[in-house]
Amino acid sequence: MTKTTTIMALVCILGMASCHAQTHQPAPPTTEGEAATVYMTTDISPEGLVRIYEALGVEAHGRVAVKISTGESENSNHLRPALIKNLVQKVNGTLVECNTAYGGNRGDTKKHRQAIAERGYNDIATVDIMDEEGEIQLPVKDTKHIQYDIVGSHLQNYDFMINLAHFKGHAMGGFGGVLKNQSIGVASTAGKLYIHSGGKTQTRWTIANQDAFLESMAAAAQAVHDYFKQEGKDIIYINVMNNMSVDCDCDGHPAAPRIKDIGILASTDPVALDQACLDLVFNHVSSKGNDAKPLQERINKKHGTHTVEYAEQLGLGTRKYTIVSIDD
């Protein structure tokens, strides 16, 4: 039988213009009719991933993009082909990625394709590097920092996107989930530079004021969401909470995870989904061999929860949610 648990959304202190450590604080309880639904399973397996997709009740259609991170190296904690194969093949999906902005093993298409082959992704599906043949601009609702979102041109080839993210820490954003996966992740190389710089440049690596960077990510995430909410298109969101290092999958030598795996969560609301995952991390009671404190500290140090706060302000979704377990 399906079990439903209503969770209180936890929020970070608002209003900091620079990057200061912030403490996760509780928000008022949700009221009926306001909460988004977030589905959850503790079964981190190919079968569990398919079941969480099916629980959403939104059928992938047309040309389906499955947005993943291919990982900087085999030492990274990216989602492995064996885990995602069944879902990708069930929806006849194409794995999609974009080149990075920091060099490394995925800084250009040739290197990226070699990395994709080495990881084994070619063995389970077609892989499309969306900015291989250029980029396009998507409109943004919020022009406080970025004036548009620069994404791989192949994005326009797809009718449906499954944003399949690995939830973990991040050296710059504090954490990475579905919002990062469709902002930085869907952006072309120039688009990544544009977001990281808070709209200052598309041609060189420039670090923005921390909140400007986080707010730019939220604005870019909304641009992609809105693109797939046009008639005939759609998008859904999945976070896999395993191998949760404090470091992102763009790190070829990440710190070892200190917190044990939690599960897979999914929603049609990206803000609610990332908020639910944050709350699971911050509500976690640490014990020997299962310590959430390093990840909590990384998120707080980078003011990471401001991304979901700002995304909610933009109308991308809500931080209020109900978790529905699909486990028996």
Feature map (PLM): residue ranges:
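Extended, low-polarity segments enriched in aliphatic/aromatic residues
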Residues: 29-328
